[in-house]
Amino acid sequence: MLDFTEASLKKVLTRYNVALEKALTPEEAAEELYPKDELIYPIAKAIFEGEEDDVVEGLQAAIEAGKDPIDLIDDALMVGMGVVIRLYDEGVIFLPNVMMSADAMLEGIEYCKENSGATPKTKGTVVCHVAEGDVHDIGKNIVTALLRANGYNVVDLGRDVPAEEVLAAVQKEKPIMLTGTALMTTTMYAFKEVNDMLLENGIKIPFACGGGAVNQDFVSQFALGVYGEEAADAPKIADAIIAGTTDVTELREKFHKH
């Protein structure tokens, strides 16, 4: 007769050197990642918790203690958001958590700007949109929040954006990257039209595409397409671009799964 008692299972796990570990809560997992600096810690924690008032309170205390407001964007706000993104990537927290944290991050950035008298340097500009005919913008909103939280200037064109408007925005803003999201299979073909318009006008920037209707095979069919499986891939692709990987083929090698 098979013995499925706890004691028996422990013996099996011990035999095969498998540790019985209690899963960490999201809060416990985050606690292990927070910086130890007593002024930075409460800010990073408030970012993770999505508490805008606590973020501002922590920033105020840090500034009064002599921290530079602009430096706090990288040293505290970005650090806190880094914890959020890491735990999201690991499946510990979910998209609503990321959105709340991104809002808290943006509130913190505004507070730092107001108290410095200077405008923090952005990494670069990214134009974002939802495919023409598609009104589902939750994915796009997450992408824009993550890009802003990671130091990018985002030009958000909204949802149901005609290809001509996308082209005009790219020509005006000269971004390092364009993003597009689509939830409906009937709308994702607009990305090919955008791609062709860009090429016809001599524009060869990476076009990161994602969303429920989109897959890697589809995005790989057009010249500028780079597939982002998750919203969190957007800032990673942008970071790769500003680090020097601007060739679409190289970006695909880095981010595509097959």
UniProtKB/Swiss-Prot annotation:
Domain of life: Archaea
Domain B12-binding: 123-248
Assigned keywords, A-Z: Cobalt, Metal-binding
UniProt-listed InterPro entries: Cbl-bd_cap, Cobalamin-bd, Cobalamin-bd_sf, Corrinoid_p, Met_Synthase/Corrinoid, Meth_synthase_dom
Record-level Gene Ontology MF annotations: cobalamin binding; cobalt ion binding; methionine synthase activity
Entry annotated with the keyword Metal-binding: yes
Gene3D superfamilies in UniProt: Cobalamin-binding domain, Methionine synthase domain
Listed SUPFAM superfamilies: Cobalamin (vitamin B12)-binding domain, Methionine synthase domain
Pfam families assigned: B12-binding, B12-binding_2
Sequence positions that bind methylcob(III)alamin: H136
GO cellular component terms attached to this protein's record: cytosol
Keyword NADP: no
Domain called B12-binding N-terminal: residue spans: 30-124
GO BP, sorted A to Z: homocysteine metabolic process; methanogenesis; tetrahydrofolate metabolic process
Function of the molecule: Harbors a corrinoid prosthetic group and acts as a methyl group carrier in methanogenesis in the methanol pathway. The methyl group of methanol is first transferred to the corrinoid prosthetic group of MtaC in the cob(I)amide oxidation state. This reaction is mediated by MtaB. The methyl group from MtaC is then transferred to coenzyme M by MtaA.
Similarity annotation: Belongs to the methylamine corrinoid protein family.
Subunit comment: Heterotetramer, composed of 2 MtaB and 2 MtaC subunits.
Protein name: Methanol--corrinoid protein
Gene symbol of the encoding locus: mtaC
